[in-house]
Amino acid sequence: MANTARIKDLSAVTTAADADILAIDGSNGTKGISYENLSTQTLDKLSSKTFSLSQGTKTLPAALNELYVGSPRNNAGSHNSIYRGVNLGTAYTSAMAAAIQAGTFDNLYVGDYLTINSRVYRIAGFNLIKNVGDNAAICNNMCLVPDASMYSAQMHNTDSGQYEPGSTTNTTEGAYVGSDMRTTNLAQATQTILNDFGSSHVIQYRDWLANAVADGQASGAAWYDCQVELMSEVMVYGTTVWGNTGYEVGCINSQLPLFRLNPEMIHRRFVYWLRSVRSAAYYANVAIDGCAGYNNASNPYGVRPLFFVN
């Protein structure tokens, strides 16, 4: 008796093994082909067939290769070129540290932020201090800047803690290195950041900092240990403005990717100090209206530092 079973009535399977045989009906009759051979032939056909795409006619392998070549890589260069702005959570994690140390920066992009103890720390760039310094090469690293001022402080302290007129209370002698901001007033920010990120992750590095002033401009510099520092005009604006000598630039000598990709992050509607010397009495700042400003050294303005982690 002839087999009258129809294909639709056969037991169904959801997977096929390479050795399974499928029926092929053609001019030479009905024959069998293994699933493995059919798959190989199908892929070969797809690989050689050309398709009309927006960038021209290409085979699938050529199109996929072009897509891969143009895709972002997991390295500092590509991650410095993308502003994402994603909330990364409330803690600096071991996974983040591992991604930084590996130099892949997985799931970390400029503009992403952590909210730790009600403080928002935003990623400002990657590997900005890699291989800088006079006696030690820094490896893979991530730069962060708080969105808000951590507190207000003076560049030159007064007994009142407020602006006081006069050349003795408004002096830039010693430039950034000699300022009360760096010698005393950044200590609170440093301790807060060490507590929030862990002292083993906040990098100590070396930078070339201005340490003398003549004729109202920085006139000397030297190497100093750094950890939590005020930003320079170059880091914020991408150029010098009021601090017009090379002593002001240091080793972090380009605009931070955060500010390059999203200038809105420069302008936060509060005044914050920069490290650059404007004159014998003034240091530079970012003004509340967005201007590249400056003011008397005894004014208490915002402390918005940068730091690096790994």
Model-derived segments and spans:
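Fibrous stalk/shaft segments of extracellular and virion attachment machinery
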Residues: 1-73
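Collagenous Gly-X-Y triple-helix signature in extracellular proteins
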Residues: 70-310
